[in-house]
């Protein structure tokens, strides 16, 4: 197997990507293609499932061709994907009966309120680890059944299949031969019992969703079956599946209980490995499955922040104080601190651990001496402060003191932000050499399943440090910063609560 590689497919919200990895975890080739975002009404977000498939199949073939290889050079394929996005298709024709309803879509918010009024919230959280929210797949499936003509009847006949994006890709790669998902994607549907590791009949009944629609749930690392499409001339084992944040946690080698990663993207996703036991959150975090390898289940706590790197886009597009995202570090570095200015970027409400949908963006501490540099500094600081709030909630829920924070995503390239994150956390922020941790995690899961890599210990030895940011800010200054942030958060909530 010396000349073989692992192909990772990373199907995201705005683009489909493919990457080839070698035995040392290095990227050999990559391909990417964006696809259309569909907004039929305010608050609705859809994708064309056929375009998801065609772009993903296209970049898979392109990545292999670019490397001068063919299918025989690929030892296995791993899939990672945007989570919760819901596709329902006809088993007989293989055609979707409606567009994919994307995780961001809010059309079922009123129905979620009805479920809460029926007293289901506590039961759903106890079984699935999730709150009732339109973010997750369950109410999206229900909407399709209720609003697409003939869907209920076809579902009763057993003709309809539901899947998250991973299931849809596997179905197409195997020409309808496999209807499967993995435990991580199942754990984001609001229908999967994370304790029994089975679809929950009580929740299916409450939501009036036929069990016959659902995929078989498998481990995150196992051989599901071979490809059967013309994308590759040879049959390649499909051998790893994980939702994007779960794959990133594994790609960061956060394999021990208490290890945490933060992905700094448009928003921020913080995930903590909690070992073999699910921890029920008392601090508005989500309990989820990190991954399953063999019979071993790892659980996780997750907190999502709505506005992370997006605050930099706002400085560029909304305020016009920078021309491109790369300028923010230079501008923010031109002052030694924010001079008492705090930005709470609640442009779409506050996410974990506050969960305040009515909160709006607020800027505090502004004086005549406030400059664009101070606002830029406050914007960067806000990403670190919000991450701190989630990490403190994780520590409170788990009883584990975080030893270090592993970082990835676009904004982790900003050294000023990473240093401030370490300063206010009081622990090191650690950036890996391979920034593509999501795709790498999918590759690792697939490679383990086919013996390309021996075990997790071998993978641990591959994790390479790019830079370690060590806390350097004096304790008194950290306290002053955090006191100011807490005042700003309280004021933002007060603004939201004032009619």
Swiss-Prot record:
<dbReference type="GO" id="GO:0019563">
    <property type="term" value="P:glycerol catabolic process"/>
</dbReference>
<feature type="binding site">
    <location>
        <position position="13"/>
    </location>
    <ligand>
        <name>ATP</name>
    </ligand>
</feature>
<feature type="binding site">
    <location>
        <position position="84"/>
    </location>
    <ligand>
        <name>glycerol</name>
    </ligand>
</feature>
<feature type="binding site">
    <location>
        <position position="244"/>
    </location>
    <ligand>
        <name>sn-glycerol 3-phosphate</name>
    </ligand>
</feature>
<feature type="binding site">
    <location>
        <position position="309"/>
    </location>
    <ligand>
        <name>ATP</name>
    </ligand>
</feature>
<dbReference type="InterPro" id="IPR005999">
    <property type="entry name" value="Glycerol_kin"/>
</dbReference>
<comment type="function">
    <text>Key enzyme in the regulation of glycerol uptake and metabolism. Catalyzes the phosphorylation of glycerol to yield sn-glycerol 3-phosphate.</text>
</comment>
<dbReference type="InterPro" id="IPR000577">
    <property type="entry name" value="Carb_kinase_FGGY"/>
</dbReference>
<dbReference type="GO" id="GO:0005829">
    <property type="term" value="C:cytosol"/>
</dbReference>
<feature type="binding site">
    <location>
        <position position="244"/>
    </location>
    <ligand>
        <name>glycerol</name>
    </ligand>
</feature>
<dbReference type="GO" id="GO:0004370">
    <property type="term" value="F:glycerol kinase activity"/>
</dbReference>
<comment type="similarity">
    <text>Belongs to the FGGY kinase family.</text>
</comment>
<dbReference type="GO" id="GO:0005524">
    <property type="term" value="F:ATP binding"/>
</dbReference>
<feature type="binding site">
    <location>
        <position position="266"/>
    </location>
    <ligand>
        <name>ADP</name>
    </ligand>
</feature>
<feature type="binding site">
    <location>
        <position position="83"/>
    </location>
    <ligand>
        <name>glycerol</name>
    </ligand>
</feature>
<feature type="binding site">
    <location>
        <position position="17"/>
    </location>
    <ligand>
        <name>ADP</name>
    </ligand>
</feature>
<keyword id="KW-0547">Nucleotide-binding</keyword>
<feature type="binding site">
    <location>
        <position position="15"/>
    </location>
    <ligand>
        <name>ATP</name>
    </ligand>
</feature>
<dbReference type="InterPro" id="IPR018484">
    <property type="entry name" value="FGGY_N"/>
</dbReference>
<feature type="binding site">
    <location>
        <position position="313"/>
    </location>
    <ligand>
        <name>ATP</name>
    </ligand>
</feature>
<dbReference type="GO" id="GO:0006072">
    <property type="term" value="P:glycerol-3-phosphate metabolic process"/>
</dbReference>
<dbReference type="Pfam" id="PF02782">
    <property type="entry name" value="FGGY_C"/>
</dbReference>
<keyword id="KW-0418">Kinase</keyword>
<keyword id="KW-0319">Glycerol metabolism</keyword>
<feature type="binding site">
    <location>
        <position position="410"/>
    </location>
    <ligand>
        <name>ADP</name>
    </ligand>
</feature>
<feature type="binding site">
    <location>
        <position position="13"/>
    </location>
    <ligand>
        <name>sn-glycerol 3-phosphate</name>
    </ligand>
</feature>
<feature type="binding site">
    <location>
        <position position="14"/>
    </location>
    <ligand>
        <name>ATP</name>
    </ligand>
</feature>
<feature type="binding site">
    <location>
        <position position="13"/>
    </location>
    <ligand>
        <name>ADP</name>
    </ligand>
</feature>
<keyword id="KW-0067">ATP-binding</keyword>
<feature type="binding site">
    <location>
        <position position="410"/>
    </location>
    <ligand>
        <name>ATP</name>
    </ligand>
</feature>
<dbReference type="InterPro" id="IPR018485">
    <property type="entry name" value="FGGY_C"/>
</dbReference>
<dbReference type="InterPro" id="IPR043129">
    <property type="entry name" value="ATPase_NBD"/>
</dbReference>
<dbReference type="Pfam" id="PF00370">
    <property type="entry name" value="FGGY_N"/>
</dbReference>
<feature type="binding site">
    <location>
        <position position="84"/>
    </location>
    <ligand>
        <name>sn-glycerol 3-phosphate</name>
    </ligand>
</feature>
<feature type="binding site">
    <location>
        <position position="245"/>
    </location>
    <ligand>
        <name>glycerol</name>
    </ligand>
</feature>
<feature type="binding site">
    <location>
        <position position="83"/>
    </location>
    <ligand>
        <name>sn-glycerol 3-phosphate</name>
    </ligand>
</feature>
<dbReference type="InterPro" id="IPR018483">
    <property type="entry name" value="Carb_kinase_FGGY_CS"/>
</dbReference>
<comment type="pathway">
    <text>Polyol metabolism; glycerol degradation via glycerol kinase pathway; sn-glycerol 3-phosphate from glycerol: step 1/1.</text>
</comment>
<feature type="binding site">
    <location>
        <position position="266"/>
    </location>
    <ligand>
        <name>ATP</name>
    </ligand>
</feature>
<dbReference type="GO" id="GO:0006071">
    <property type="term" value="P:glycerol metabolic process"/>
</dbReference>
<protein>
    <recommendedName>
        <fullName>Glycerol kinase</fullName>
        <ecNumber>2.7.1.30</ecNumber>
    </recommendedName>
</protein>
<feature type="binding site">
    <location>
        <position position="309"/>
    </location>
    <ligand>
        <name>ADP</name>
    </ligand>
</feature>
């Amino acid at each position: 197997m010396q000349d073989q590689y692992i192909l990772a497919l990373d199907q995201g919200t705005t683009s489909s990507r493919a990457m080839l990895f070698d035995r040392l975890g290095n990227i050999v080739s990559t391909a990417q293609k964006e696809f259309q975002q569909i907004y039929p009404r305010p608050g609705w977000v859809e994708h064309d499932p056929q375009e998801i498939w065609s772009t993903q199949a296209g970049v898979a073939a392109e990545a292999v061709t670019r490397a001068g290889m063919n299918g025989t050079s690929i030892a296995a394929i791993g899939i990672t994907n945007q989570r919760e996005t819901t596709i329902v298709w006809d088993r007989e024709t293989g055609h979707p009966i409606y567009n994919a309803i994307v995780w961001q879509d809010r059309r079922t918010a009123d129905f979620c309120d009805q479920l809460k009024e029926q007293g289901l919230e506590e039961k759903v959280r106890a079984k699935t680890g999730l709150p009732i929210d339109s973010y997750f797949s369950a109410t999206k499936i229900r909407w399709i059944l209720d609003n697409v003509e003939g869907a209920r009847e076809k579902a009763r006949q057993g003709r309809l299949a539901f899947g998250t994006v991973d299931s849809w890709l596997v179905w197409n790669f195997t020409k309808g031969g496999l209807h499967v998902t993995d435990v991580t994607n199942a754990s984001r549907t609001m229908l999967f019992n994370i304790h029994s590791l089975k679809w929950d009949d009580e929740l299916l009944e409450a939501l009036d969703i036929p069990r016959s629609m659902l995929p078989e749930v498998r481990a995150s690392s196992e051989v599901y079956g071979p490809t059967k499409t013309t994308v590759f001339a040879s049959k390649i084992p499909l051998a790893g599946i994980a939702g994007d944040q779960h794959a990133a946690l594994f790609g960061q080698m956060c394999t021990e209980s208490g290890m945490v990663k933060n992905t700094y993207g448009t928003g921020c996703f913080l995930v903590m490995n909690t070992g073999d036991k699910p921890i029920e959150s008392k601090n508005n975090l989500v309990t989820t499955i990190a991954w399953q390898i063999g019979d071993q289940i790892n659980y996780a706590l997750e907190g999502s922040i709505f506005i992370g790197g997006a605050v930099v886009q706002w400085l560029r597009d909304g305020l016009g104080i920078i021309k491109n995202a790369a300028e923010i570090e230079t501008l923010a570095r031109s002052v030694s601190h924010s001079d008492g200015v705090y930005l709470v970027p609640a442009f779409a409400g506050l996410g974990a651990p506050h969960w305040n949908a009515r909160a709006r963006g607020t800027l505090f501490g502004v004086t005549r001496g406030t400059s664009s540099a101070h606002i830029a500094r406050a914007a960067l600081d806000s990403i670190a402060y919000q991450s701190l709030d989630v990490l403190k909630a994780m520590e409170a829920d788990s009883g584990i003191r975080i030893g270090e924070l592993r970082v990835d995503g676009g904004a982790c390239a900003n050294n000023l932000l990473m240093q401030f994150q370490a300063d206010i956390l009081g622990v090191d922020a650690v950036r890996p050499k391979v920034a593509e941790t999501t795709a790498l995690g999918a590759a690792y899961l697939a490679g383990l399943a086919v013996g390309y890599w021996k075990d997790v210990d071998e993978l641990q030895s591959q994790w390479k440090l790019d830079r370690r940011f060590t806390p350097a800010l004096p304790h008194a200054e950290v306290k002053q910063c955090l006191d100011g942030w807490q005042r700003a958060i309280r004021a933002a909530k007060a603004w939201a609560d004032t009619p």
